A protein has these predicted regions:
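Nucleic-acid substrate recognition interfaces
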Residues: 1-319
Length: 319
């Protein structure tokens, strides 16, 4: 799209009603006032009816022009103490768009949610296969039709996943949403063609979901936190050690023989690592060393699980 400079109120923009306005445009070598009509918006439904209206922008998309009006307000993020916090731990997996679990400061799992987009992901897989096949046949052709389809599906998955995460967090009165920290993209060996493209799309979608959720969470007064992602799926949440994956990869087989959803187990560990880190930050190094002696798994951050946090809570009480 093409974005024009900001239309400052008074000398570039004058609102005449809820759906009409005058904007100053350069037409035929002269600056003239042009009457425009735009679609009405339900500000009450969007929750911005009491917010300050900012200067609009004129945006051109294709052959159409849109008037983008933003609103602003000072929003205070929560300052709840760690012992009273309720978090939503989110694991952005492969088989599911996201797996969410709500935990409290005692390690109790209060709610769970699976967010799936099977239809969109199947369509995305077909679109990437068609794109790679067409590029092999034509060489370096850009293939805008396929890319428009892929980008549209990516945007649908991203926006819907972020909206469901925020809705789930609001439903359970969450204070903080916790994600894994995403480092630079490292493509594994043996990934090429459509498989390599899907890996890139999946990584870009995860980054986009985190950014979108952060924006929407701050709008609701929630905070965002990120934890070390290493081995969250590798270790069982019950402390039984490393897990094996089922042939499909969606189930984790514990050393005890128990089978559990791999992404759900990872979300428990993500939430536990957040609470462990916040407890460590709130006490002295001497106290933490004493606690680590009682709970040895705390010494290695990449091996911390929900069982580690529950054990920590048995020897540590909030002041």
């Amino acid at each position: 799209h093409k974005e024009f400079p900001v239309l400052y109120k008074g000398n570039m923009f004058k609102r005449t009603s809820d759906t009409t306005a005058c904007i100053k445009a350069f037409v035929k070598n002269d600056w003239v006032w042009v009457d425009v009509v735009f679609r009405p918006q339900d500000l009450f439904k969007r929750g911005v009816h009491e917010w300050k209206e900012c200067n609009p922008k004129l945006v051109k998309q294709g052959k159409k022009y849109f008037l983008n009006i933003s609103y602003e307000q000072q929003v205070a993020l929560h300052k709840e103490k760690i012992q009273h916090q309720r978090i939503c731990a989110v694991d952005l997996g492969l088989t599911n768009s996201a797996v969410c679990s709500v935990l409290d400061a005692n390690g109790t799992v209060l709610a769970r949610k699976f967010i799936r987009h099977q239809r969109e992901k199947d369509q995305l897989r077909r679109a990437t296969n068609y794109l790679r096949k067409a590029q092999r046949q034509t060489g370096t052709a850009s293939m805008p039709r396929y890319w428009n389809r892929i980008n549209g599906l990516q945007k649908q998955i991203l926006n819907d996943t972020a909206a469901q995460i925020i809705q789930f967090a609001k439903q359970h009165h969450v204070h903080t949403i916790v994600f894994e920290y995403l480092d630079k993209m490292r493509i594994p060996k043996g990934y090429y063609g459509a498989k390599k493209l899907r890996f890139k799309l999946h990584y870009w979608a995860k980054k986009g979901i985190q950014n979108k959720v952060e924006e929407m969470a701050h709008y609701e007064g929630m905070r965002i936190s990120r934890v070390n992602p290493r081995n969250t799926s590798k270790y069982a949440f019950d402390g039984s050690g490393e897990v094996k994956r089922s042939p499909r990869g969606d189930l984790a087989i514990f050393s005890t023989g128990k089978q559990y959803h791999a992404d759900l187990s990872a979300s428990y560990n993500i939430g536990a690592r957040y609470f462990i880190r916040e407890i460590q930050k709130s006490i002295s190094e001497k106290e933490w060393s004493a606690l680590s002696a009682n709970v040895p798994t705390l010494t290695t951050r990449t091996k911390q699980t929900l069982a580690s946090f529950i054990t920590l809570r048995t020897v540590f009480s909030f002041s």
